[in-house]
């Protein structure tokens, strides 16, 4: 269970929670590997909208993500086509960043990233839009 989180108290909670310590079924493994195959395909990469803001976060000590190499590879593959792609890697953190010892920092970083995008959307909405097609050239005050 140590691979999941850096917080010893949460490690104990995970170890004692039957919903976290169950054995994966053959079907679950099949579905997981099918999903992994799809999200690593050229088809999937081609379907990701270029304007979609993406933030990848990972713990550098997460064995599931190959110690942040997996996240970095996906981000590198998307970086040429994406207009807003960010990567944040956390030293000494593992798989579940939101239950680790640095969770307050992670939550603050997520909130900052989200607020930056909301501020950008709000600024764009406040910018007057010119309606040229209707004959009148008034500012469109869409909200």
Where on the chain are the PLM-derived regions?
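Alpha/beta-hydrolase-fold enzymes
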Residues: 1-19
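Active-site nucleophile elbow and catalytic-triad environment of alpha/beta-hydrolase enzymes
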Residues: 25-46
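Short, proline-enriched alpha-helix->beta-strand connector loops that line the catalytic pocket
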Residues: 48-54, 83
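Short beta-strand/loop motif that positions the catalytic acidic residue
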Residues: 56-58
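Acidic beta-to-alpha connecting loop that harbors the catalytic carboxylate
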Residues: 60-63, 93-94
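Conserved alpha/beta-hydrolase "acid-adjacent" motif
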Residues: 63-73
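Catalytic active-site module of serine/aspartate enzymes centered on a nucleophile-bearing elbow/loop
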Residues: 84-138
